Amino acid sequence: MSHHSNRKVEVRRVDECTTMDELIRHCFPAFGGAFLRRIYTILDQAVGMGCPISVAVAGPVTVSGQHQAWLIPLLETGWIAYISTTDAVCYHDGHRSLTEHKAGPIFEVPIWGDDGALRDERTIRVTDMAFDEDVLLDQDKFLSAVLTHPDFQHKMTGTELRYRLGGIYGRQEQRSGVKPGLLAT
């Protein structure tokens, strides 16, 4: 019994594809293409059947605004039901809500820029996103004050902590007039 299909490798040029489905199914034949097609197929079937998805998210998701571009909309539509993420993602989620920085604390910098010059300017770089060092200092002050509230003065799980922080962040975002962040969603 053969364990392979002998499927002929036929690819299309990307400019010949009109949909994401065609692109994924016909333009990535090797070196991870099979994995990408399999993941795409599973997700396409799950979403098509109405099955909620669980995702693990790391990296500069909230710094770069990806949470507002795709993660929150997928949560709100029910396509994603559960998120596992890092403390850094949750920490950076609060930057835009800070009163002192509501005008937009995060800006783009060259990914291969001069880190020494950025350090001298007191600029923190996260890949190609950056913010003034004061954003971190103000975030620390904000969180330190929040964590002294009575609601935070007992043992709790990380899930409860993030839920409670989400409520605080949500109220702060409303006061600052900024879009809701990940924890407030």
What are these regions (language model features)?
Residues 1-185:
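Metallocofactor- and cofactor-centric catalytic cores in central/energy metabolism, strongly enriched
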